[in-house]
UniProtKB/Swiss-Prot annotation:
Complexes and interactors: Part of the ribosomal stalk of the 50S ribosomal subunit. Interacts with L10 and the large rRNA to form the base of the stalk. L10 forms an elongated spine to which L12 dimers bind in a sequential fashion forming a multimeric L10(L12)X complex.
Origin organism lineage: Bacteria, Pseudomonadati, Pseudomonadota, Alphaproteobacteria, Rhodospirillales
GO biological process: translation
PANTHER family, per database record: 60S RIBOSOMAL PROTEIN L12 (PTHR11661), LARGE RIBOSOMAL SUBUNIT PROTEIN UL11M (PTHR11661:SF1)
Identification of the protein by name: Large ribosomal subunit protein uL11
InterPro entries linked: Ribosomal_uL11, Ribosomal_uL11_bac-typ, Ribosomal_uL11_C, Ribosomal_uL11_C_sf, Ribosomal_uL11_CS, Ribosomal_uL11_N, Ribosomal_uL11_N_sf
One Gene Ontology molecular-function label: large ribosomal subunit rRNA binding
Length: 144
């Protein structure tokens, strides 16, 4: 018989830097899951990635206090900020000038990396989503 799922926990954890402090500890502790076991498994799975890169993770908690987790690709905003060379997006989008620039080639590159996590049929559709995210962050998308 399959294990009974008691809940899903969605977190964004820096790659290779998971520790039992908040937000991980309290989120897993509420479900009675072994926090240190998750920390060890997550850090081992993300050891080959760039340290500190935010990794979305979905943890499935089971009734017998076991868990499984799935890591996703980093958020679009992380890739856009890295490509534009900025620390954060604009606080006043549209009123002030753009805070950074990315090329369509960089957008397509981000789209291919994020394709499996996006709800798009092709890379061009994913690229359009990323252009929208860039605009909302105050990043200008230029051809080239």
């Amino acid at each position: 018989m399959a294990k009974k799922i008691v809940g899903y926990i969605k977190l964004q954890v820096p790659a290779g830097k998971a520790n039992p402090s908040p937000p991980i500890g309290p989120a897993l502790g509420q479900r009675g899951l072994n926090i240190m076991e998750f920390v060890k498994q997550f850090n081992a799975k993300t050891a080959d990635l760039e340290q500190g890169m935010p990794i979305p993770v979905v943890i499935t908690a089971y009734g017998d206090r076991t868990f499984t987790f799935v890591t996703k690709t980093p958020p679009i905003t992380y890739f856009l900020k890295k490509a534009a060379g900025i620390d954060k997006g604009s606080a006043t989008v549209g009123r002030s000038g753009p805070v950074g620039r990315v090329t369509m080639e960089q957008v397509r590159d981000i789209a291919t990396k994020k394709m499996k996590d996006l709800n798009a049929n092709d890379v061009e559709g994913a690229a359009r989503m990323i252009v929208g995210s860039a605009r909302s962050m105050g990043i200008e998308v230029v051809e080239g």
